[in-house]
Amino acid sequence: MAVRVKICGITRVDDLHAACDAGADALGFVFYEKSPRHLTLDAAAALLREVPPFVQTVGLFVDANPAFVDSVLRAVPLDLLQFHGDEKPADCARHGRPWIKAIRVRADTDLLKCAADFAAASGLLLDAYVPGVPGGTGARFDWRLIPPRLPQRVILSGGLTPDNVADAVRRVRPWAVDVSSGVEAAKGIKDAQKIARFISQAKAS
């Protein structure tokens, strides 16, 4: 079965169309003010009106106030929530939507414990640990740190590009891959050719 691909950090309608036309399975929209890919509610709602059928929409949050998450959900019809901070399982589950939990992986991260702690998650998104930055860094972690029989679905992220995603898929065999900076021309601005090549390389592996 072909790996699924999420293009994260969508800020422009042209980038949304480029991702969907290239075969993206999911699109990520960032609701974190410190990110250069952050969206207002109005901007996000306008973008989601352009999403075609059968493409999943994912909202990314970092230690957000629950009331803020609820306000986003009232304005923006997201399919899946992605929590990228220090949220506890109860924080993630309280909104009544499917969710995934990002884990910033370093050498001493116990991923089996993370999988047990977040057993109710639809999957674990594994990203590189960079001090003070919750994600979107373009940094890669050592894939050998991923246990071979992790009970959760693995969404591999962190430092993926069109040049290394095929190798990543062959070595890790993740449920999905997630990319943001690896397909950008500048922060928040995607490169349509990079998107197309990334998806082609990921799904051919």
From Swiss-Prot:
Molecular functions per Gene Ontology: phosphoribosylanthranilate isomerase activity
Metabolic or biological pathway: Amino-acid biosynthesis; L-tryptophan biosynthesis; L-tryptophan from chorismate: step 3/5
One BP term from GO: L-tryptophan biosynthetic process
EC assignment: 5.3.1.24
InterPro entries in the cross-refs: Aldolase_TIM, PRAI_dom, RibuloseP-bd_barrel, TrpF_fam
Catalytic activity: N-(5-phospho-beta-D-ribosyl)anthranilate = 1-(2-carboxyphenylamino)-1-deoxy-D-ribulose 5-phosphate
Sequence intervals crossing the membrane: none
Domain of life, source organism: Bacteria
The entry's keywords: Amino-acid biosynthesis, Aromatic amino acid biosynthesis, Isomerase, Tryptophan biosynthesis
Coiled coil: none
Enzymatic class: isomerase
SUPFAM superfamilies: Ribulose-phoshate binding barrel (SSF51366)
A Pfam family matched in the record: PRAI
Family the entry assigns: Belongs to the TrpF family.
PANTHER family reported in the protein's UniProt record: N-(5'-PHOSPHORIBOSYL)ANTHRANILATE ISOMERASE (PTHR42894:SF1)
Protein's recorded name: N-(5'-phosphoribosyl)anthranilate isomerase
